[in-house]
A protein has these predicted regions:
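Gly/Ser-rich catalytic/binding loops embedded in alpha/beta enzyme cores
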Residues: 1-121
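Amidase signature
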Residues: 1-23, 175-268
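Alpha-helical scaffold segments in soluble metabolic enzymes
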Residues: 14, 63-66, 138, 168-175, ...
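Short, small-residue-rich loop/turn micro-motifs
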Residues: 35-39, 75, 140, 147, ...
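A generic structural motif
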Residues: 67-71, 165, 242-246
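Generic structural signal for helix capping and beta-alpha/helix-loop junctions
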Residues: 79-81, 123-124, 217, 255
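Short low-complexity, flexible loop/linker segments enriched in glycine and/or proline
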Residues: 85-90, 129-132, 255-267
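Fold-level recognition of mixed alpha/beta catalytic cores in primary-metabolism enzymes, strongest
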Residues: 86, 105-210, 223-226
Length: 268
């Protein structure tokens, strides 16, 4: 977790000059962005690699810079993307979720409007839910990635946007998604306009609800009945907006053996 206040001011001054000179502006022009420190950002610490400074930007970071975003710093993670700090911005006695917690906190606390997280097993979604922002686990290959220092890490994880609302999340995804010739696993698909249908509503959508995702009751930790009830009420409340909500009770094979096998290939 590193703050580059001086560098951010320099980038902001350059962004101001670009406006004054009538230069072409990118979709993130002048917007502060924080990057989870498992991502490589030139000149910043990479917590995953245990390096105080790396000498290159990964592809998503390149695209943020090109779009005019101002990278003000990196957010805290921890070994194997699990940590003791930071704490929940709403209550310091509560946990803010797992590894992308630093990015979630930076967004929710108003430090930045946009951040990048990482998700392999809920690492973006849980901090977003627990801290109160939007977090997206992107499909494999949607956001290209190449890192020759830890090539196996992204076999289970993908980079994704975190923001205060769906529109901002879509805006950041618009910038970082799309194929790149350096990543042979990148999806070779055109990037749609992710903001185009945000105001369309959910009438007619089919939405599935499960209280354990098909395996947690049988194989994992017990659920909180209160949390399950609140989320279930929220899910079925979507029917009032025209969605078709269906409860499913499928039971899947336990995922942990496969996850543990993949994890053995993670660096460190």
């Amino acid at each position: 977790d590193t703050l580059d206040a001086e560098g951010a001011r320099e980038q902001a001054a350059a962004a101001t000059r670009a406006v004054e000179e009538g230069a072409e502006l990118g979709p993130l022009h002048g917007i502060p962005v924080a990057i989870m420190d498992v991502h490589s950002v030139k000149g910043f610490r990479n917590g995953l690699l245990g390096r105080d400074s790396v000498n290159y930007d990964e592809i998503a970071v390149e695209r943020i810079r090109k779009a005019g975003g101002i990278i003000i710093g990196t957010t805290a993670t921890y070994n194997w993307a699990v940590a003791e700090k930071p704490r929940n911005p709403w209550n310091l006695e509560l946990d803010p979720g797992n590894s992308s917690r630093g990015s979630a906190i930076a967004v929710v606390a108003g430090m930045v409007p946009l951040a990048i997280g990482m998700d392999g097993a809920g690492s973006t979604r849980l901090p977003a839910a627990w801290s109160g922002c939007m977090g997206l686990h992107t499909s494999k290959g949607l956001v290209p990635y190449v890192d020759y220092d830890s090539p196996s890490f992204r076999s289970t994880s993908t980079a994704g946007p975190m923001a205060r609302d769906a529109r901002d999340c879509a805006l950041l995804l618009q910038v970082i998604a799309g194929p790149d010739g350096r990543d042979f696993q990148a999806l070779q698909l055109p990037v749609p306009d992710y903001t185009a249908h945000i105001d369309d509503g959910i009438e007619g959508m089919d939405i599935a609800w499960t209280d354990d995702f098909g395996w947690s009751k049988a194989y994992w930790l017990p659920d909180s009945a209160g949390v399950v009830e609140f989320v279930k009420n929220a899910a079925f409340g979507l029917a009032r907006s025209g969605a078709q909500v269906h409860e499913i009770d499928d039971v899947w094979d336990e995922p942990m053996p496969i996850f543990n096998l993949l994890s053995k290939h993670l660096p460190g």
